[in-house]
Amino acid sequence: MTIRLHAFTLDCADAAVLGEFWARALGRELDPGAGREFASIGLQDPGRPAPCWMFARVPEGKSAKNRMHPDLMAADLEAEVERLVGLGATWQADLKLGGMRWSTLLDPEGNEFDVIADAA
């Protein structure tokens, strides 16, 4: 049996708003029909780059640090962090471990994600 990643799904208060942030952050388009209850990126495109992203409205708010989060890679870490903050992210910390550098940010609903400096 082969398993593959289909989607990242984020619980949220407003799926369209959070979906639009992530679409802009990833340089992708929000799928047609996005609304407050559900939105997606790449779900309706069979030729999409995997994985797709889904956003589902839930009644409860975020109450703790994410146990899993996306790590994005950027050629220019500082410029990408500045761009994401301009889209609505909140910078949390700049970190370094071994030869790897990254910044931790929060999306508009407080979900953690990292932007890693591409060492290539």
Model region roles, listed by residue range:
Residues 15, 70-109:
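Vicinal oxygen chelate
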Residues 41-46, 105-108, 118:
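Active-site beta-strand termini and strand-to-loop segments that position acidic
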Residues 2, 9-52, 80-82, 86, ...:
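Core segments of cupin and vicinal oxygen chelate
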Residues 33, 119-120:
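A short acidic/small-residue loop/turn micro-motif
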